[in-house]
Structure formats: C-alpha cells, structure tokens
From Swiss-Prot:
Highest taxon above the source species: Eukaryota
Protein name: WD repeat-containing protein 48
Annotated WD repeat ranges: 28-67, 73-112, 115-154, 166-205, 208-247, 250-289, 292-334, 358-397
Positions bearing Phosphotyrosine: Y28
Free-text comment about domains: N-terminal WD region interacts with TIP and C-terminal region mediates lysosomal localization. The WD repeats are required for the interaction with deubiquitinating enzymes USP1, USP12 and USP46.
UniProt keyword Heme present: no
Residues recorded with modification Phosphothreonine: T613
Outcome after substituting K318A: In UAF1(11A); impaired DNA-binding. In UAF1(11A); does not affect ability to promote USP1-mediated deubiquitination of FANCD2 and stimulate RAD51-mediated homologous recombination, because of DNA-binding mediated by RAD51AP1
Organismal lineage: Eukaryota, Metazoa, Chordata, Craniata, Vertebrata
Record-linked PROSITE patterns: WD_REPEATS_1 (PS00678), WD_REPEATS_2 (PS50082), WD_REPEATS_REGION (PS50294)
Compositionally biased residues, Low complexity: 609-620
Length: 677
C-alpha cells in the first residue's frame, strides 16, 4: 500500500534529482552574503548567503581562524536570518521556499516550515513576544510563535500559523517592533503596508516610494518606520499621522540595507553605490560617509555591545564580510567632516576594515565539454578548474589560465547527448538530472576509462551509473539475498554472489555529496548527504520521495534501452557500382564506423565477389575461414566510408558523424567505396 501511495505521489509531480560538487567542509562563504546576525553574549557572528550555507564565526579578534561551524540544510540562497530566544534559536528564510528553525548553539536544523509557495525573502522578529514573521514572493506573510516552533518533534510536528493577506506584489522587506504590535511590509508595489499582528487587521497603506522597498525598520513602540528603496531614498514615516515626515537623499543609487541605533536617532544605510553613511534623523543635512565597500551592500549589522555602537558588520555581493569601526563617528559634527551636499565627494571615516572574515571564490562561468562528462569552470578569482560530473569531484585546478584556450585544448570530435543541466546560482556546481534526458547518454566502458573484470567493453549509461552511485548507501538499492533459499543458491554459485552488491560496480561519488530531490519548479522535497541514505529516517523519507524513474534504475536495475539511429547505406558515385535498393537501416547510435565498414565488406563486397567467381573445389565461401579480427583488418584495408563526401575515421560513432558531419535534417546517409590499390 505504501509503495502504491508513493508512486501516486510521484505521478502527481515531476521530481528531479540534483547534487552539489563541493568539498566536505566549505569553510568560506562562496558567494554574496544576504544576512547577518550578531550574538554579543557568545561573540559569534552568523552569516547566511547565496551559497545556501549559514556559517558561524568567532568575532574574537585574537582568534587566528574565526570559522566555527556550518549549518547546512537549505538548497538555495538563504535570504534572511534572525536570532531568537537570547541567541539559542536561529530562524532562516530561503529561496528554496522554506523557513527553517535551528539550534543556534549546536548548529543543527530542528524543523522545516513549508508554508510558503515561493522564495522566502524576509523575516521580522518581535523580541518581547518571541514572535517571527516571514514573507516572500508568494505575497504572503506568516506569523510564527518561536516557543511553539522550538517544541516541535517528529511526532508533535503540527504548527498553527496566522497569515496577513492583502499584498498585491512580491514582498522584499519586513519589520516588526519589539513589542509585536506593528508589522510593516515593503514590496515591488512601492508602498508600505501596515498590520496589527495581534488581530491580523490591516491598518494602513503608505505611499511615497517610486521603486521596490528593500529595507524596513520600526522603533520600539511602533510609532515610526524607516524605509530604504531602490529609488535611492530613505524615508521616515509617522504611523500615527500615516504619512512620510522626512526624506533622506543620501545615496546615488538604490538603498538596500538599513540599521538604526536603539534611540532611533541615527540611521546607517548602504546599497548599490557601495557606500555606507550614518545620517542624523533629526538633522537630515548632516551625514558622514563611514566607508566604501568593494561591492554593493546587501546587509548590515550593528554591534550593540555599547552605546553608541562601536562597530558595524557589512555584507555585500562579494563573499568577504567586513567589520568597520564607528569610534569617533558621533564627533563628526564638531570636526566639520560631514556632507551636506551629496554631490561633493567626501573622505570616508574609515579606509580599512577593523576585522575581515575572508570569503572564498564563486564559480561564475562554466563550459560542458563534448564528452558530456567533464566541465571547465572559471571563478571570481579568475581561476580555472576541471571537474568530473560523473564522479562528482574536482579533477584539477588549472590556475589563472585562458578559459577559451582550455576549452579549445580539450575539444574532441566526439558527440554525446546532453543528459544533465548545470546551475551556478550558489557559486558551486549544482548538477540536475531530469527524467526527460537523464538516460540519453551511453558510452563504452573503455571510452569512460573503466575496465570490466571479464575484459569485455560493455556499454554504460552515464545517468544510470550516476544515480546508482548517488543512492549507493540506500539499503533498498542493495542486491542482498535475504532468504535461505536464495543464500543456498548463491552458495552454490560461489561466495562472491553472497556479498551485498552496492552502487554501480565502477566508481563511487564522495560520501559527503549533498543529494536533493525537488520538484521541477524549485521546491525542495528532501535533501540529504549521500552517506546518510542508510539511516532509518532518511531511508523512510527516500521511500516516500524517490520518483519511479529513479527506482527503475537503482532498485529494480532496469537499465534504459539503447538509442537507435536510422541511416541509409549506398555505394559512392565514384565507385561506379549500381545504387542499391534504398533500405532504411537502424543501429545503436554508439556503433562505430568500422563496424559499418565490416558490414559493407562482409555482406556487400564479399557477396559481389562471390557472384563473380566460381565456387572453389571444396565449396567453401570466401571469408568463411576468416576470423572476425581478420575481417575487421581487411575491411579497414579495403573499404572507405564517407558522409557528405568526407572520409570517416573508423573510430567515430554514428551519433558523432550525424552531429559533426551530416549536420542536416532527415536520416543520415553514408556512402562506401573500395580503396584504390
């Protein structure tokens, strides 16, 4: 019954399989950092970003290596995080459409909330009420009681949520006051919408911005709101008066990040122009340029360990996170080093960050080579690398070499059908397998660099082999004789067969490889590490998630059928031979040209010779005593095969001929002729 239910479930949705080629421990942010949270009690900084990983860092400057741990469960960009319960719990929002609840001290995911139907872009937190709100591109806002979320278990896994409706466009920013009495959302609608989270009642809509509202802040009692927009302005709103009471034109481009001191007197702003300003809200003409980053600013986090704040952490579209000192900033008025005309360039307060959390490189360019197995990539440091998709690993770092030259250098006149797709969104290689083309690529074991125990050269399906390797640890895929009768049979056949057979028998992928089952629209159904599929819980979830097209290969061992290619075989015009009846032939698309040459020699040329000569005295037909190898040698000596008047390499296969030489619609046509002696 369970299996029947699983197949029905799989039938209702198209499930893809993805995996990430990466190191076991990814110590450094590999892409832009979208969110920051500081835990001053433990001197820890949490970063969350576009590589899908949340990392914990020590902000103790005496520590040589600040990295503490990674929190991994998301499969797409992490867009926002909030620390709750005095730093014990972390809530995260992601483009994988989930909100996750983490034990922040121990670094593990406690539960996953799947209420959103699209990217979750923003979170808001009411500290006094332990209330969190989440919002995103599905235009929905959901309210979560943190104490309820942290009490969820495998058996007690139902949670009730309130929702705030009324947004007409995708939500990009969210704010809630500490008391949990006001919530504000910002969206591409260019307005601020305001609710009372206690009653879910809509209170007002505030107009004034002319572009997306990317950042929002509320004061403690919820009477004032600050907003930053892609229109380049910061606005201060009075919720009591339901209007904008001040507009700050500080930046040259969009404002994407805001922070404010506890007294709500100074706003810190950053955005597309890479500059970070501090502006006195009471005197809009007075502002100081704190620093200039090397990339657009995505998020900032004030160090609130003292008042005024001694420093600010800044995250950008690059992977490095910087801490900038704010010491002396509130004396800028006296020194006169401030900007009251944003058209005049001013000197930044800081030219170097006080502390740096170094980031790693992000892959920004890739090229799939002709063998449809290897990939060349280029990263943000201009380093080129060579990867093996089949074995899910990096083969070689090539350094700062010319990317296009490396592609040309590795070009082979070979055609293998596409059987996977590549995504670079996280800055790492994510490979996706889809039922529609996963099994399109067959190669010979020899061409793939694999040897068979019996010395044969079997045909291997790349997608099938990879799926078997990804699920190698899942007990359901193991060939394991369970009952006594089977054991007796295998005992007769020898000890070898009595062993559990795992994987594909040719190669393994790194056990730490993340494997993701997701709907073909982006929603993740299940993520696990390759090595964990033997666990009881993981195995049960795989039973519910793995689609039938993967079961067929990994569990039932039903390999797909070979791809056939139709073609016509005719004598070349120069041979003077009579054109044959145009029979449409069909063969495996991996069939080598030499095999067609053998067919021509044995079935056409030899038969012609036989009809023109008398039978020998012992009535033996020509070629009967020739071995297969001799026929192959003779065929290559005597026969030429051509396509589009180009003589073909005997090692080329039919699909390569069709792709590189035929290059036309309709069925492939090959011509043969005898070599001139």
């Amino acid at each position: 019954m369970a299996a029947h239910h699983r197949q029905n479930t799989a039938g209702r949705r198209k499930v893809q399989v993805s995996y990430v080629i990466r190191d076991e421990v990814e110590k450094y942010n590999r892409n832009g950092v979208n969110a920051l949270q500081l835990d001053p009690a433990l001197n820890r900084l949490f970063t969350a970003g576009r590589d899908s990983i949340i990392r914990i860092w020590s902000v103790n400057q005496h520590k040589q290596d600040p990295y503490i741990a990674s929190m991994e469960h998301h499969t797409d960009w992490v867009n926002d995080i909030v620390l709750c319960c005095n730093g014990k719990t972390l809530i995260s929002a992601s483009s994988d459409t989930t909100v996750k609840v983490w034990n922040a001290h121990k670094g593990f995911c406690m539960s996953t909330l799947r209420t959103h139907k699209d990217y979750v872009k923003a979170l808001a937190y009411a500290k006094d009420k332990e209330l969190v709100a989440s919002a995103g591109l599905d235009r929905q806002i959901f309210l979560w009681d943190v104490n309820t979320l942290t009490a969820l278990t495998a058996s007690n896994n139902t949670v009730t949520t309130s929702s705030l409706s009324g947004n007409k466009d995708s939500i990009y920013s969210l704010a809630m006051n500490q008391l949990g009495t006001i919530i504000v959302s910002g969206s591409t609608e260019k307005v601020l919408r305001v609710w009372d989270p206690r009653t879910c009642a809509k209170l007002m809509k505030l107009k004034g911005h002319t572009d997306n509202v990317k950042a929002l802040l509320l004061n403690r009692d919820g009477t004032q709101c600050l907003s930053g927009s892609s229109d380049g302005t910061i606005r201060l709103w009075s919720l009591g008066q339901q209007r904008c009471i001040a507009t700050y034109r500080v930046h040259d481009e969009g404002v994407w990040a805001l922070q404010v001191n506890d007294a709500f007197t100074h706003v810190y702003s950053g955005g597309r122009d890479r500059k970070i300003y501090c502006t006195d809200l009471r005197n809009p003409d007075i502002r100081v340029l704190i620093c200039e980053e090397k990339a657009p600013v995505l998020k900032m986090e004030l160090d609130r360990s003292a008042d005024p704040p001694p420093a600010i952490w800044v995250a950008t579209t690059k992977s490095t996170v910087n801490k900038w000192t704010l010491k002396g900033i509130h004396n800028f008025r006296a020194s006169g080093d401030y900007d009251n005309d944003c058209t005049n360039p001013i000197t930044p307060l800081c030219t170097q960050p006080d502390q740096v959390i170094k980031g790693g490189a992000s892959i920004i360019q890739c090229h799939i080579l002709n063998d449809k197995r290897h990939i060349l990539t280029k990263d943000t440091n201009n380093n080129v690398a060579y990867w093996d998709v089949l074995k899910a690993c990096k083969v070689e770092d090539l350094g700062k070499v010319d990317f296009e030259d490396e592609i040309k250098k590795r070009f082979k006149m070979v055609y293998v059908p596409n059987w996977f797709s590549v995504d670079l969104k996280t800055g790492m290689l994510t490979i996706t397998l889809d039922e529609s083309d996963c099994f399109a690529a067959w190669v010979s074991a020899k061409d793939a660099g694999f040897s068979s125990p019996d010395g044969s050269d079997p045909k291997l399906n790349l997608g099938g082999l990879l799926l078997q390797a990804l699920l190698e640890y899942w007990p359901r895929t193991h060939v394991n004789p369970m009952d006594e009768e089977e054991n007796e049979v295998n005992h007769v056949n020898g000890e070898q067969e009595n062993r559990v057979q795992k994987g594909n028998g040719y190669f393994q992928v790194p056990p730490h490889t993340p494997v993701i089952f997701g709907e073909a629209g982006g929603r993740t159904l299940f993520r696990l590490l390759c090595r964990d599929s033997g666990g009881e819980t993981e195995s049960m979830l795989l039973n519910e998630t793995v689609p039938q097209w993967v079961i067929d290969i990994t569990v039932d061992k039903n390999m797909p059928k070979f791809n056939k290619i139709p073609f016509y075989l005719q004598p070349h015009a120069s041979s003077g031979a009579k054109t044959l009846k145009k029979d449409r032939l069909s063969a495996s698309d991996m069939l080598q040209v030499r095999k067609v040459m053998e067919h021509v020699y044995e079935k056409i040329i030899n038969l012609d010779n036989e009809s023109q000569t008398t039978s020998s005295s012992n009535n033996e037909k020509p070629g009967e005593q020739e071995k297969e190898e001799d026929i192959a040698v003779l065929a290559e000596e005597k026969i030429e095969l051509l396509c589009q008047d180009q003589v073909l390499d005997p090692n080329m296969d039919l699909r390569t001929v069709k792709h590189f030489i035929w290059k036309s619609g309709g069925d492939l046509t090959l011509h043969y002729r005898q070599k001139s002696t």
